Amino acid sequence: MTQIYSFWRSTGMFAALLLCLLCTNLSAGTIYVQTNLVSNVLGLAPTTDPNLINPWGVSFAPKSPFWVSDQGTNLATLYDGAGNIKSLVVSVGPTPGPTGQVFNGTSSFGLPDGSPAVFLFSTLAGTLDAWNPGIIPITTSITVATTPGAVYTGLANGSVGMANYLYAADVTGHINVFDTNFTNVTSTTFAGKFVDPSPVAGFTPFGIQNINGNLYVMYAQLKGVIGQPGGFVDEFDTSGNFIKRIATNGQLFAPWGITLAPGRFGQFSNDLLIGQFGNGEILAYDPTTDAFLGTLNGKNGMPIVNDFLWSLEVRTMGPNVNLDALYFTAGIDNQMGGLFGEIAPVPEPGTITLLLAAAGSGGARKLWRRMRA
C-alpha cells in the first residue's frame, strides 16, 4: 500500500506540474515558430534561389507545388511544401512584374491553344497574364488583358451563378472585373459595385482574396510603394455588393495577405489571419464576430515580423505540405530580396497529452517492477 501511495504521489505531482505548465502556456497564448524555406539570401534558408525577389502572390492547384509571383524578377517560381525548387520557371508579364495570382480550376478563360488558363497573374504594369502547359515555350505566359493607367496589386477569381470572373485590385482606386473572354466589365456588368458605403479618404484597394466564396478587399494608404499606418478590410459578395467591414485601423498597417488558419493552429485555429505589409506582423480576428484576437507571437513573446510581408496561404494537400502550417512570402531587404517560409504552433497540439500519457505509463512500469521485487 505504501508503494502504491508513493507511486500516485510522485506521478500525480509530476502530472500536476505538467498541467500547470499547460495552463501557463494557454494563458500566455500559443507560441509560434517560423521556418524559413527558400530565400535569395545565402544561408537565410536551407534552399537558395536567386530568382526569389520580392515574392507577392501565391497560388496552387490541389496537388501542385506552390506557384510564387516574383515581382522583382518578372518570374513565377515553383516550390513544394518543404521548399524544394521545381524545375519549371515561368516568365510573367511586362516589367515591373507580377503581383497577385490565382489557380483556375474551371474550363473558362480559354487561351489561343484552345485550353483554359491554369494560372493567371496581375502585374504592376496593369496587365493580366495567363499560363497553361500548351503555351510555347512552356516557360512563358501570355498577356491576355491590358488596362491603361491601372496598377494591379492583387488578383482573385470567383463566380456569379454560372459565370466566372477575375477581380483585380487597382491601387488607382478600383476593383476591375474581367469576364471569361478577358473583357473588362467593370463599367458594365459591375457598374457601381465594390463600393464601401463609408469610404475612408486616402485609402485604396491593395489586396483581394476569395475566402469561402466571398471577396475580401484590403485597403491601404500608399505613398509610392511604402505602406502607411492604418488600413481596413471589407467583405463583398462576388457580384460586388458590400457585406460588411471586417476590420479597420487599430492594429492594421497596410494589410495585403489574408487567409483562414488551419484547424490545428493553436489558439488561432480556424481564425481569420491578416498580414501587414507595413510592419510585417500577422493579426488574428474572429471569423464570426470580427473581434481582434491578437498577433502571432514567437518564443520571445513578441510578434513574428517579416518585413514587407505579402501572401498568407494554407493548404489541405500538396507535395511535402505541412497541413498545420501557415505559408508566407515576404519582400525582405526593402523588397530587394525574398523569403518563402512557414509558421506553425509550438508545442504541437497534443504534446502535453502525450507527455502526461508517457508519465503515467512510465510510472506504471516503475510500480509494476517494485511490486514484483
Q: How does the language model describe each region?
A:
Residues T24-A28:
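Sec/Tat signal peptide C-region and signal peptidase I cleavage site
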Residues T2-F14, L367:
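Bacterial N-terminal signal peptides that target proteins for export
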Residues G12-C23:
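Bacterial N-terminal signal peptides
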Residues R370-A373:
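Short, charged juxtamembrane terminal tails flanking transmembrane helices
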